[in-house]
Amino acid sequence: MNSVIVIPVLLILLFCFSRFQEVNKVKSYLYLSCVWMLTWLLVFYNNCFVTFISIALLFFMLAFIFKNKRNKIIKLSLFVALAISFFITLFIMLSIFIQSISFFNKVAISEFLFCLKWGHNVVTINEEKIGCFGIAPLLVGTLLITIIAMLVVVPLGLFSAIYISEYASEKVRYIVNTTLQVLSAIPTVVYGYFAVVFLSVFIKQVANFFGLSIHSESALVAGLSIGIMILPFIISLLEDAIRSVPKSLRYGFMALGATPAETIWHITIPYAMPTILSAILLSISRVIGETMIVLMAVGINANLTFNPLNSVTTITVQIATLLTGDQDFNSVQTLAAYALSLVLFIITWLLNAFALFVMKRN
């Protein structure tokens, strides 16, 4: 109730001070002093909501006072937002890099890169028992699941995008795009539940029908689930890429007697190919960073295998596993999560950089 009373009073006082300044040509610093005094009186009012509103009003009134310098204020605000984002990213990168150095001081880089097991053999380094931290099984598992997911999502996404952009009516396009937006908002844990309860059982029944042996937690289940999950994402990207092709090129080629299918194959796809490739690379980055579906559908067993019917694990799953529970921050297991984060960061950064390079070539 006090907040409801104080806020309108503050607004009235601010307006009166503003009019008083304009009429009597009072210096701006006197006006600002009054605004600051009112604001910080409300800060000590011991009400977070009133404090937030009063500070927001302060910045609004500052912008109103310096309306002749509004462009400079907006430019400065945008620069501050950019600087905050940059330094947050830089801080994350530095923290990961520093903790990774601490890990490699305890575990040799050669073991990390070339050991074929993860967490199986127990060795002793500096009188401390730790596991064998070889990233090879994690890289193979990540690569295997990514390949399966992209084999599913690229053909379905490309054909769906072509139909939506070239053949579907406006009503159908609106319904499909709305549905894709809804599907994109579904949490990944729902797709993980779908993979465990339905997809895993279905694939196991199909494999048994053909006489194949398959684990209940397999890379095939995880790859298919992630492919289904990112399908709305890649369809939207590919549709935008196809619709960006100028209509003059299409109509000019069709005026020469080409069919719509020939126009798509010879004009639309080649012209939009750089954007299509960048969309695929961005989708790969999202597949590599997925954690929940893989954790629910595959598990944490780090097996070095290229068989999609066997159980594998990924880099993100091991990061989540190593940081789960009560862990010593300086333990080798915790530091291993930072080393894996560094590898994951480098991989995704290279993919995104290559995607931007492909788009610039367009």
Language-model regions, residue ranges each:
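Transmembrane alpha-helix signature in integral membrane proteins
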Residues: F44-F59, F133-Y163, L350
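Membrane-topology segments of multi-pass transport proteins
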Residues: M1-A81, N105-K106, S110-K129
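Membrane-interfacial helix termini and adjacent extracytoplasmic/periplasmic loops
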Residues: I98-I101, N105-A136, Y191-I228
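Interhelical loop and adjacent transmembrane-helix boundary motif
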Residues: A207-F210, V294-F345
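Amphipathic cytosolic juxtamembrane alpha-helices at the membrane-cytosol interface
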Residues: S169-N177, P246-K247, Y251-S278
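C-terminal transmembrane helix and the adjacent membrane-cytosol boundary/short C-terminal tail
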Residues: S18-Q21, E239-R243, K247-R250, M254, ...
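Cytoplasmic-entry segments and transmembrane alpha-helices of multi-pass inner-membrane transporters
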Residues: N24-S28, N71-V80, L156-A195, L237
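Transmembrane alpha-helices
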Residues: L237, I242, P260-V298
